[in-house]
């Protein structure tokens, strides 16, 4: 999910106060530091920082996954350490990498999923992405209209209008001449961008035009800007083209043509719309984007085609030919096409053709749908950390926190209303202090301002026979791998395993026996009959059942 955070560095928000010295129970997994601040990192030079994860419990804990969130649909933070086991009191150092695709301030979260029954620790991740090409410094931390304005200024300031004759001569003889531009031709060679037709052996532009039927395609048709300079001679939207396909394109918008009346070399037209061959779709899209931001959307020409051009831009990204062409034009014209250098700029502009405003996205990712303590000793306080991440692009408000039953369940701090910003996490610490070993079946409820998710109800279980039996899995060193799992997983123990395995949902309802295959101290389980979700697996031995949890993907 997209993460937008163009603001100064700040500490991660903790909803609950830290547990006081009166709380005796261990907190499960702990992390250090609580925040990884990567500083400024270039897109060409990713950086990594260490994170220490410690098991404070008296039983083994397995880290089942490390969850990250995306920035404009792509991950900026990552780690290769996604699954590992920690013995009681043990620590492990993992390295987290920051690889920014965008030159913006990143604010995100890392959440460590585990089977320790004390909640999931989270780590605040912050860093400033920066582009190695200083030409784009003015675009840093900008999006939507502010980014469009920065791109317009960047591509305008210092640029040179060559004039139409010089621009065309440069295109025919240097920029797109495959003998001169590194494409390996031994003679002057041009390729029509729409049909792939080649002109070989021409002597100059006039020769190519007069004797070979080639001319210059204006990707944004010059009719719409009255053939005025500097638009007419801007090389970023000029391409060599044969006369026939150029005429077929005419002033028509780009589109996907389903019933063509003309086709050649992969390009098609129905007389009203024009679809270029695949080799030119991405280039046409980026030329249109550049032109509209550098100048304007004359006569609204881009508006009807922007969506299909965005699709082509994504499907046909810039290649070495595009990058070399961009460099050659920069050497002559002193400006660049930003969508060739950094195609991801498009992710930060909702609309090129009209007023660009990011849609408001309120979204939450609660880490668990059920709070399970396992066994909790009487008169001792055990704390569970319930984490919710704001993975939208606007602040989310929380209100009306409530726990039942009380005083067995209480907030380790305060249950006051609060608000968390995009990229932040709410870490709600819930204390369980039973007076006996009797089962505790409780409920956490709260409200938010997220459409479709205004009310949350999270079941809480402690000393429940089926959930407490999960602890027994650690005492017999029963392990499940992989977890999360697909359609198959392995139960592994120090001794020979025997007995049927049953699956249960989180209410304790039996879902039936699972198919198994015994291989020494391992049991291969078939999970194909389970839908994606979280389940309990019970190995029924002669000494009684032993339970562990699995996440089915």
Give the residues covered by each predicted segment.
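Surface-exposed binding patches on compact interaction domains or structured appendages
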Residues: 28-30, 57-95, 361-370, 393-429
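Residue-level detector of functionally pivotal "anchor" positions at catalytic/ligand-binding pockets or at interdomain
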Residues: 353-367, 444, 461-481
């Amino acid at each position: 999910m997209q993460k937008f955070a163009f603001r100064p560095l700040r500490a991660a928000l903790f909803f609950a106060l830290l547990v006081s010295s009166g709380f005796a129970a261990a907190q499960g997994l702990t992390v250090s530091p609580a925040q990884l601040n990567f500083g400024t990192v270039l897109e060409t030079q990713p950086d990594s920082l260490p994170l220490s994860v410690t098991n404070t419990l008296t039983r083994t804990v397995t880290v089942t996954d490390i969850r990250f969130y995306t920035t404009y649909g792509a991950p900026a933070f990552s780690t290769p350490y996604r699954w590992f086991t920690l013995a009681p009191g043990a620590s492990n150092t993992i390295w987290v990498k920051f690889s920014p695709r965008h030159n913006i301030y990143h604010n995100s979260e890392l959440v460590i999923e585990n089977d320790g029954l004390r909640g999931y620790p989270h780590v605040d991740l912050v860093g400033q992405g920066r582009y190695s090409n200083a030409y784009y410094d003015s675009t840093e931390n900008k999006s939507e209209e502010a980014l469009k304005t920065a791109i317009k200024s960047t591509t305008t300031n210092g640029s040179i209008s060559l004039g139409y004759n010089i621009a065309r001569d440069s295109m025919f003889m240097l920029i797109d001449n495959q003998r001169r531009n590194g494409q390996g031709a031994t003679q002057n060679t041009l390729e029509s961008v729409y049909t792939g037709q080649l002109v070989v052996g021409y002597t100059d532009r006039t020769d190519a035009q007069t004797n070979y039927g080639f001319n210059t395609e204006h990707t944004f048709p010059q009719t719409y800007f009255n053939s005025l300079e500097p638009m007419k001679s801007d090389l970023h939207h000029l391409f060599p083209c044969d006369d026939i396909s150029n005429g077929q394109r005419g002033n028509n918008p780009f589109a996907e043509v389903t019933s063509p009346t003309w086709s050649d070399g992969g390009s098609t037209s129905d007389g009203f719309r024009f679809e270029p061959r695949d080799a030119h779709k991405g280039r046409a899209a980026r030329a249109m984007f550049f032109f509209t931001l550098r100048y304007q959307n004359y006569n609204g020409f881009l508006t009807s085609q922007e969506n299909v051009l965005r699709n082509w831009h994504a499907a046909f990204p810039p290649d070495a030919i595009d990058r070399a062409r961009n460099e050659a034009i920069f050497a002559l014209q002193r400006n660049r096409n930003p969508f060739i250098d950094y195609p991801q700029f498009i992710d930060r502009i909702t609309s090129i053709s009209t007023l660009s405003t990011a849609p408001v996205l309120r979204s939450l990712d609660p880490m668990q749908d059920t709070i399970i303590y396992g066994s909790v000793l009487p008169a001792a306080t055990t704390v569970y950390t319930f984490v919710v991440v704001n993975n939208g692009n606007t602040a989310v408000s929380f209100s009306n926190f409530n726990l039942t039953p009380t005083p067995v369940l209480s907030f380790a701090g305060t249950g006051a209303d609060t608000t968390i910003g995009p990229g932040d996490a709410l870490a709600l610490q819930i204390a369980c202090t039973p007076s006996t070993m009797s089962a505790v079946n409780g409920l956490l409820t709260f409200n938010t301002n997220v459409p479709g998710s205004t009310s949350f109800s999270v079941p809480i279980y402690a000393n429940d026979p089926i959930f407490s039996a999960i602890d027994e899995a650690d005492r017999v060193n029963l392990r499940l791998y992989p977890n999360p799992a697909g359609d198959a997983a392995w139960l592994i123990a120090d001794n020979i395993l025997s007995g049927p395995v049953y699956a249960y949902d989180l209410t304790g309802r039996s879902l039936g026996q699972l198919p198994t295959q015994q291989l020494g101290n391992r049991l291969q389980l078939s999970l194909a009959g389970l839908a994606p979700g979280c389940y309990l697996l019970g190995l029924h031995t002669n000494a009684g059942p032993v339970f562990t949890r699995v996440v089915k993907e």
